[in-house]
Each structure stands twice: as structure tokens, then as C-alpha cells.
Design a protein with these regions (language model features):
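Pyridoxal 5′-phosphate
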Residues: 1-231
Length: 231
């Protein structure tokens, strides 16, 4: 009898044993609220701060630029909806091959007065130059192009694209969920080129589901998706 072979690691990965071992204490005896001032809470806060430093180091960012979320979809929605809420409606450009958690919230913004441009790709799945230039000519306020496509594996040079978008003043986001752990990510370097936000998720690289992050340039103003809990 044959056992199934798992070949869908682009969708999700099993939790690495080392990751599970690191998590177990916080699923058992360590249960403090990191906002609490007693020792249980302080221990949890120290663990979160350490995790924040580790994530920042993995993507070449400063720990203060790391915002934890419950998943890549939430992180992407945080940028699209959160940034749009702080701006007057205008042009929003996303590549035509973005993940649905970018495309769907972008389409929802049309009902709020935004204009959506879906940037075409060529026969190789790369950003079509003419379509990109047309979008930039419309002075977009928000742009999103993924670093690595989850279905085709096509890589987009987001730093180069962001640099061409600098004159528009748009906030540039890249979904780097599929790139994490497979390609070098240097947020500081990308940020100098004009990438303002990138999003990543743990479950693609042997981490748990429900753990992700948005890496944010501090100049980007976002409205929170969830109100309360600011303590």
C-alpha cells in the first residue's frame, strides 16, 4: 500500500521540529499576557521582543519596522485597506497575477471611489513594461507587485520597479511570502529603492500557521483593521 507524498510546499510546509520545540513552552507552562506587568507577562514580552528581532534580522529590517499579524492575508489586507483609509481615493495599481488577498481588497476599494489598474504581464509572466508605464503615468497612490509568484515561480525585480515608481510618490508594497527562505530579502536595501512595505508568513518556511508580519517603512501611515487592544 502506497503512502501519499506531500508535494505542495508552496502552499504550506510542515512545522519544523526545532520550531515546535521553541513553541511548546508557550503553549504549556508559559501563558502570560505580554501586556501584563507581572513576571508571567514580562517573560512573554521578552519572548515577543526576541522574535521581533529575529524576524527583522531575517529580512534586513529594524525591529521597530516589524508588525506581527495572524497571516499573510491579514498582512496584505493591512497594507491595501490600511493605507487606502489614510489617503484620498486615487489610482491603485496591482499586478494582474497577485494573490487574491491583494486583488480582492483592491477591488473592494473601487466601491470607495478608488480606480484600480491591473498591471498586465507578458508571455513569461513578467511585468509588461508598457502596462507598468501606463499605470505610473496615472500617478498612482498605492502599488503592489509580488516578489515571487506562488503558482508560476516567476520573480519580479521589485526594487527596480519601485525605483521607477519613486517620482509618483506612491507607497510601494511587495508580497514576499513565497520569497522568504528561498531568496535573499534586504528591506533596508529595497527601501532605499522605494519599497515601503513587504509582507511575509511563517508557515511557508516550517513555521506555524497564524504567524506572519508586515515590514513597514515608518513613513507609511496605516489605519488598523481591528480597533481596541492597544494596551
Amino acid at each position: 500500500m502506497f503512502a501519499p507524498v506531500y508535494l505542495d510546499h508552496n502552499a504550506t510546509t510542515p512545522v519544523d521540529p526545532a520550531v515546535l520545540a521553541a513553541m511548546l513552552p508557550w503553549l504549556q507552562g508559559q501563558y502570560g499576557n505580554p501586556s501584563s506587568r507581572h513576571e508571567y507577562g514580562r517573560a512573554a514580552r521578552r519572548a515577543i521582543d526576541e522574535a521581533r528581532q529575529q524576524v527583522a534580522a531575517a529580512v534586513g529590517a529594524h525591529p521597530t519596522e516589524v508588525v506581527f499579524t495572524s497571516g499573510g492575508s491579514e498582512a496584505n489586507n493591512l497594507f491595501i485597506k490600511g493605507a487606502a483609509a489614510c489617503l484620498k481615493p486615487g489610482l491603485l495599481g496591482v499586478s494582474a497575477v497577485e494573490h487574491p488577498c491583494i486583488v480582492k481588497p483592491a477591488e473592494q476599494l473601487v466601491k470607495q471611489g478608488w480606480t484600480l489598474a491591473k498591471i498586465a504581464v507578458d508571455g513569461n509572466g513578467c511585468i509588461d513594461v508598457a502596462s507598468w508605464k501606463k499605470c505610473l503615468s496615472g500617478q498612482p497612490k498605492l502599488l503592489s507587485v509580488m516578489r515571487a509568484n506562488n503558482e508560476t515561480g516567476v520573480l519580479h525585480d521589485v526594487a527596480a520597479l519601485a525605483e521607477t515608481a519613486l517620482p509618483t510618490g506612491a507607497w510601494f508594497h511587495t508580497d514576499a511570502v513565497q520569497a522568504l527562505g528561498k531568496l535573499p530579502i534586504d528591506f533596508r536595501e529595497w527601501n532605499r529603492s522605494g519599497v515601503h512595505v513587504l509582507t511575509i508568513s511563517a508557515h511557508k518556511i516550517g513555521g506555524p500557521k497564524g504567524a506572519a508580519a508586515a515590514i513597514l517603512d515608518k513613513r507609511v501611515e496605516l489605519s488598523p483593521l481591528i480597533a481596541g487592544g492597544g494596551h
